[in-house]
Amino acid sequence: MKVLIVSSELSPIAKEGGLGDAMAGLAPALDALGCEVKVAIPGYGHVLESCPGAELITENVRVSMGYFNMTADLRKVEPAPGVEAYMVCNESLFGRHGVYGDNDGLFMDNHKRYIFFSKSIPALCSASRYIPDVILANDWQTGLIPALMDQGHMPQTASVFVIHNIGYLGYVPPEDASMLGLSNTYLSYEGMEFYGQLSLLKAGIAYANKLVTVSPTYSREIQTTEQGAGLDGLMRKRSQDLAGILNGVDFQVWSPETDKHIPCNYSTADMAGKGKCKKALLDEMGMDSQLMNAPVAGMVTRLFSQKGIELVIGAVPEIVENGMGFILLGNGEESYVRDLRRLAQAYPGRFRFEEAFNEPLAHRIMAGADMLCVPSLYEPCGLTQMYALQYGTIPVARATGGLADTVRDIKAFAGKGNGFTFDAFSPGAFANAMDRAGRHYKNRKAWSALRTKAMASAGVFTWDMAAEQYYSIFERAVRARRL
């Protein structure tokens, strides 16, 4: 089966968040199943600079943007073994340093950039005489593609659309509707119209042959008014075409047995290295040495409301006053940064805030902490809790989205639990869950057994398993396209 993955991100060359990692993990896993996989991404300026040997495949392919035309070039690059990637290049739209924005904020023409990217896919496939069996489009940046295919483009190809986060709707101002190249039927409420705007995400949801989101629980949550971002009615309408598939983990990157970023490797057969990692982390972060005999929580996150940062700010005083240490690595909204700095000043040696995106430090926190906090308001899939399980670092998570599918509370799943969960989105509920984890930590034998269960449970979160589920969806999409 020929599969074309279309994405705005692909690790390691164009990464802003989990989307890039997901595409880099899924592509080789599908290849291993026997699929002929290609990945198309925009030719961002900084990516082209990092890939000077990118092979020119075709150039000056005309892409209609309504009242005017633009051109696209196609270049081939291999960012990682088993990943055949193609960059859609246009200097005026993508020749910049940044995926969605730069230091001054998001690019104001992002909707135009990704309309062009989406419309270039059928044009470039036609120019290169390439006919995939399936296009796998991802999030609002590629949501126009299923609508174009429904209108008649690429009639021999099926479309599968992946919702990584329903909260990002990809608005197009009505005055730019001509760029889309769609008839008025597609611009109606039954199509991509959304409260006076046009939504590229809604276009993908409305017109793809099959839909996927990134966890079973999230697939149900987005059918509710609370978490459907105004699209819950459409999600319920298309529920029979929707599947929830957990993302996998790249165990070549995230493994305590081989991790080059941590001071001492370890495994379930020999856990001595985890204690050494904890001591090294406490020393590096300037934490109280007495915390070697107390639970230390870590958190690796972006500082946005989705991630439950207000719960952390509200609960940290109680957590550290109960004898725990807390290390938080992340960057984002300035209001959260100020509050976290204030807490670090109030609890020196007990609470450490590191304002940065620092992947090597993220690995060291994952290995050195006793538990990992994920108190998200919502979490479509989540990866850090899966990393934590792999490292024997017990997750304390709010039971939402992918967190509910991967973290099993030791009380609710007697004998099979791998962490601690809570339901209410409040500092008190988070603090109570942390208190339960802290009390369990004091029973060293029970904590050791829990770590072993956690590490064993991580083994199912593979891209190979996810790829098999995607392949099944592709087969169903191809059958649906032929009807």
Swiss-Prot record:
Belongs to the glycosyltransferase 1 family. Bacterial/plant glycogen synthase subfamily. It is an enzyme of class 2 (transferase). Gene3D superfamilies: Glycogen Phosphorylase B. Keywords: Glycogen biosynthesis, Glycosyltransferase, Transferase. InterPro entries: Glyco_trans_1 (IPR001296), GS/SS (IPR011835), Starch_synth_cat_dom (IPR013534). One of its GO terms (biological process) is glycogen biosynthetic process. Pathway: Glycan biosynthesis; glycogen biosynthesis. This is Glycogen synthase. It catalyses: [(1->4)-alpha-D-glucosyl](n) + ADP-alpha-D-glucose = [(1->4)-alpha-D-glucosyl](n+1) + ADP + H(+). The gene is glgA. The keyword Transferase applies. It comes from Desulfatibacillum aliphaticivorans. One of its GO terms (molecular function) is alpha-1,4-glucan glucosyltransferase (UDP-glucose donor) activity. Its EC number is 2.4.1.21. Synthesizes alpha-1,4-glucan chains using ADP-glucose. ADP-alpha-D-glucose binds at residue 15.
